[in-house]
């Protein structure tokens, strides 16, 4: 499966990013490049909406950590919402549920 990256600005003036599909070793660079580009362009807090995220592997989690660090350097925030139970479990097992603000 492939990855589609949708994004919009929310009413809270946050950049909401919706990865659609799978984030793995093959699609992680695309996600990283797009989000880093958006951070440079918009310089806003980010919400990752996992509603349509079907799968994420360790390379995808690494990309999210890179995004987290980049936002921290800019005094910006990231939150993750609407994760499916199997994906939340991966965040829980790796301890990233304590790093990221995860809601829903």
Segments predicted by a language model, with ranges:
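Amphipathic alpha-helical interaction surfaces in cytosolic regulatory modules
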Residues: 25-99
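Short acidic-hydrophobic, aromatic-tinged amphipathic segments that line or gate anion-handling sites
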Residues: 101-104
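STAS-typified acidic loop motif
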Residues: 7-33
